[in-house]
């Protein structure tokens, strides 16, 4: 380092310097396809979390958690001598980021300990909750993830205060870097109201999809009311909408709010100006802790978190009907907390309903409610539900237990992923149940014979590939929903989706069902094949045929064991959110969106857990297999369709072709002979992306080389197999 220099020479990634995205803001972000790699994971490639969790003494962990609840620490004293309320909030906020629109968020990855969630305003002081848990995490190490421990701590908090939970399942594996594919909103200001630039609201308070929170940095709603307006009825609209986007109906919503607010208190002892920076902005000596407060002691009775101050009911560390009793018993006056936040205090409170101070037993306070809380009384939808619960404690307790379990397990996927001795035996509709295998599975000879029958049925390569893909592509790695298992493509709503080409689908399924019935009726040893398996097998057979057409021999991997779900096991409304509005792999776009077709492709690839090379080879294969929606010619850059060749890449990168937008459709392009002007090909933005984007073009060049034919086939088969088995957690 030169003695006159201001700093040593470091790369621009260490500090400063313009990134590619800074220079070209519209550049496609492919980095989201390469998150959570082994390079960021300290556990190593061979680490098997499920195996480690099965070694865990869950009862011992729970015993330690119960002890922690009342082991108040001087550096962060427990309210009422019990940390239960804090840990319930931690678990709730870990799970509450889930949104059903894209399945992202939720408790399943332990992301609350990473940016941005660790520094969201709504997560203020939850860093203290995780630090309180650290001795237990340290004790049990790799056998319990942070993701599981945070949820378990919430359960133990409830149980230690007298509530009977519905159950607990482990199996959440931690991530080790922020989940950068999650869109939290476009605002550039924490808690920006809807009148600010880049608002998530449009029209008559229409919330942008897939967002499920009303402001940047909140989990659900603003407790003070919409944009801070203390209107309980208006707040009811926000409460219903945000909880619905997290897959909760109004009854579950009331149960969660009333049940969760039975415990603990809010903190707003003084002005927010006393509160220091969040963890990600805090100085290095803070060691990852944020929101250091200069108000009084900065803790205990002087704590500032949400700005709202007080408890909802007497006895905040005990499960009872106090919340609903107080909600309906009293009239409420609007006040401002010591921090300046809108809240409501009960009027003319009976002595029995006064709340003892959380840190000074000589003081008592009136119960408080937030504006959002009062929506449970005054909203025309939520109010009657809350009133009914107030008169039926057993129904309320059962509803809260089930809703809490759903809240904390919604993003875990099928029950086959659940681990531990406290997994509930009851099958729930929101778990997308699939029957257990109850018959002998087909073997290698059966598979070969069935493939021959399928290929002789009159169904084309493209029809078989399209149907198998349509069945499997609903899978979302975010919340582990969808996929080919269950054969729900034959059920409502999937059988009616435009992208699944209902008329063709009906024809294909009829022929496959005929083959299935004939095979099953011919067996005498209990052996059967499901339609779910046969749909996937049809795709495998078609790809093998296409490879043979190209001169390559080989077998596409196939593992039987899928089962057929029933319509009764399928919540049609819940599955509606899985409908692809865009699927670049089938060159399908339902309508023009504000998001580009290529961005939608990357998002779909991410949900399918594909890398950029996997996405690239998959697109190239699907195009030459003629597997476009509506048999569209766009992107079918080959003169020999249904033949598994690298023609897509060869012809896309041919400098003898010049591309220009088609006059009739600005989303379609024409590729014409550079010399004669004759039309050679047509393609979409998705197709041309692989010649336009420098990173994807580099990958496309690999597959366009003369010696790449066999590699292309092998790589395509590998990624096809990955997608077909994405939901086969039983194979793990």
Curated annotation (Swiss-Prot):
Site (Transition state stabilizer): 89
Cofactor binding summary note: Binds 1 heme b (iron(II)-protoporphyrin IX) group per dimer.
Residues the record marks as active site: 93
Chain segments carrying region Disordered: 1-20
Tryptophyl-tyrosyl-methioninium (Tyr-Met) (with W-92) crosslink site(s): 220-246
The keyword Heme is annotated on this UniProt entry: yes
InterPro entries assigned: Catalase_peroxidase (IPR000763), Haem_peroxidase (IPR002016), Haem_peroxidase_sf (IPR010255), Peroxidases_AS (IPR019794), Peroxidases_heam-ligand_BS (IPR019793)
Gene Ontology, cellular component aspect: cytosol
Covalent cross-link Tryptophyl-tyrosyl-methioninium (Trp-Tyr) (with M-246) as placed by the record, residue numbers: 92-220
Binding, heme b: 261
Subunit structure: Homodimer or homotetramer.
Protein's organism: Desulfosudis oleivorans (strain DSM 6200 / JCM 39069 / Hxd3) (Desulfococcus oleovorans)
Reaction catalysed by this enzyme: H2O2 + AH2 = A + 2 H2O; 2 H2O2 = O2 + 2 H2O
EC number(s) on file: 1.11.1.21
Protein's name according to its UniProt entry: Catalase-peroxidase
Stated role: Bifunctional enzyme with both catalase and broad-spectrum peroxidase activity.
PROSITE patterns listed in its UniProt record: PEROXIDASE_1, PEROXIDASE_2, PEROXIDASE_4
GO BP of this protein: cellular response to hydrogen peroxide; hydrogen peroxide catabolic process
PANTHER family cross-referenced by the UniProt entry: CATALASE-PEROXIDASE, HYDROPEROXIDASE I, BIFUNCTIONAL CATALASE-PEROXIDASE
Post-translational changes noted in the entry: Formation of the three residue Trp-Tyr-Met cross-link is important for the catalase, but not the peroxidase activity of the enzyme.
Family: Belongs to the peroxidase family. Peroxidase/catalase subfamily.
Primary enzyme class: oxidoreductase
Key words, A-Z: Heme, Hydrogen peroxide, Iron, Metal-binding, Oxidoreductase, Peroxidase
A single MF term (Gene Ontology): heme binding
Necessary cofactors: heme b
A Pfam family: peroxidase
């Amino acid at each position: 380092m030169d003695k006159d220099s201001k700093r040593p020479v470091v790369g621009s990634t260490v500090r400063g310097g313009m990134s590619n995205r800074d220079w070209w803001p519209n550049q496609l972000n492919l980095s989201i396809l390469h998150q959570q790699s082994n390079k960021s994971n300290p556990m190593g490639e061979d680490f098997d979390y499920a195996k480690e969790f099965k070694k865990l003494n869950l009862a011992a962990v729970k015993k330690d958690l119960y002890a922690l609840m009342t082991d108040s620490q001087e550096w962060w004293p427990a309210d009422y001598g019990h940390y239960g309320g804090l840990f319930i909030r931690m678990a709730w906020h870990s799970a509450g980021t889930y949104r059903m629109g894209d399945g992202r968020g939720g408790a399943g990855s332990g992301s609350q300990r990473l940016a941005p969630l660790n520094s969201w305003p709504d997560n203020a002081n939850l860093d203290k909750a995780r630090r309180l848990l650290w001795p237990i995490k340290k004790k049990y190490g790799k056998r319990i993830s942070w993701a599981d421990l945070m949820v378990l701590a919430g359960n133990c908090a409830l149980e230690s205060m007298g509530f009977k939970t519905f159950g607990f399942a482990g199996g959440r594996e931690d991530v080790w870097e922020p989940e950068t594919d999650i869109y939290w909103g476009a605002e550039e200001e924490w808690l920006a109201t809807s009148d600010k630039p880049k608002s998530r609201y449009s029209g008559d308070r229409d919330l942008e999809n897939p967002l499920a929170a009303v402001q940047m940095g909140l989990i659900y709603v603003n407790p003070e009311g919409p944009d801070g307006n203390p209107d309980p009825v208006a707040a009811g609209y926000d409460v219903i909408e945000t909880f619905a986007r997290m897959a909760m109906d109004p009854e579950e919503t009331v149960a969660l709010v009333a049940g969760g607010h039975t415990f603990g208190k809010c903190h707003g002892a003084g002005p927010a100006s006393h509160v220091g920076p969040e963890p990600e902005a805090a100085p290095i000596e803070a060691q990852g802790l944020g929101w250091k407060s200069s108000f009084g002691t900065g803790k205990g009775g002087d704590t500032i978190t949400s700005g709202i101050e007080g408890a909802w009911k007497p006895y905040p560390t005990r499960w009872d009907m106090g919340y609903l009793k107080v909600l309906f018993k009293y009239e409420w006056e609007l006040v401002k907390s010591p921090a300046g936040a809108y809240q409501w205090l009960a009027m003319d409170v009976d002595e029995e309903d006064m709340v003892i101070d959380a840190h000074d037993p000589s003081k008592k306070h009136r119960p408080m409610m937030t504006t959002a809380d009062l929506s449970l009384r005054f909203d025309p939808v939520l109010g009657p539900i809350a009133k009914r619960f107030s008169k039926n404690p057993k129904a309320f307790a059962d509803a809260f237990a089930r809703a809490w379990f759903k809240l904390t397990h919604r993003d875990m996927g099928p029950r086959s992923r659940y681990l531990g001795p406290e997994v509930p035996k009851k099958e729930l509709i929101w778990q997308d149940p699939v029957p257990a295998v109850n018959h002998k599975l087909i073997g290698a000879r059966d598979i070969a014979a069935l493939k021959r029958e399928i290929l002789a049925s009159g169904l084309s390569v493209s029809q078989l590939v399209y149907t198998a893909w349509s069945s499997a592509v609903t899978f979302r790695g975010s919340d582990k929903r969808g996929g080919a298992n269950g054969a729900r493509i034959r059920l409502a709503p999937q059988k009616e989706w435009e992208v699944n080409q209902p008329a063709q689908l009906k024809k294909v399924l009829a022929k496959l069902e005929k083959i299935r019935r004939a095979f099953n009726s011919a067996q005498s040893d209990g052996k059967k094949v499901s339609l779910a398996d046969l749909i996937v097998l049809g795709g495998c057979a078609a790809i093998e045929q296409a490879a043979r057409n190209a001169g390559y021999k080989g077998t596409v991997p196939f593992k039987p064991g899928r089962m057929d779900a029933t319509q009764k096991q399928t919540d049609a409304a819940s599955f509606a959110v899985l409908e692809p509005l865009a699927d670049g792999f089938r060159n399908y776009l339902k309508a023009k969106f504000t998001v580009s077709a290529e961005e939608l492709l990357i998002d779909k690839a991410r949900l399918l857990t594909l890398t950029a090379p996997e996405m690239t080879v998959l697109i190239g294969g699907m195009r030459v297999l003629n597997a476009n929606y509506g048999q569209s010619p766009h992107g079918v850059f080959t003169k020999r369709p249904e033949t598994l060749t690298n023609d897509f890449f060869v012809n896309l990168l041919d400098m003898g072709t010049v591309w220009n937008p088609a006059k009739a459709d600005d989303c379609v392009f024409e590729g014409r002979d550079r010399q004669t002007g004759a039309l050679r090909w047509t393609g979409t933005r998705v197709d041309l992306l692989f010649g336009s984007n420098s990173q994807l073009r580099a990958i496309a060049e690999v597959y366009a080389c003369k010696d790449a034919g066999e590699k292309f086939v092998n790589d395509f088969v590998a990624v096809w197999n990955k997608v077909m088995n994405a939901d086969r957690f039983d194979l793990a």
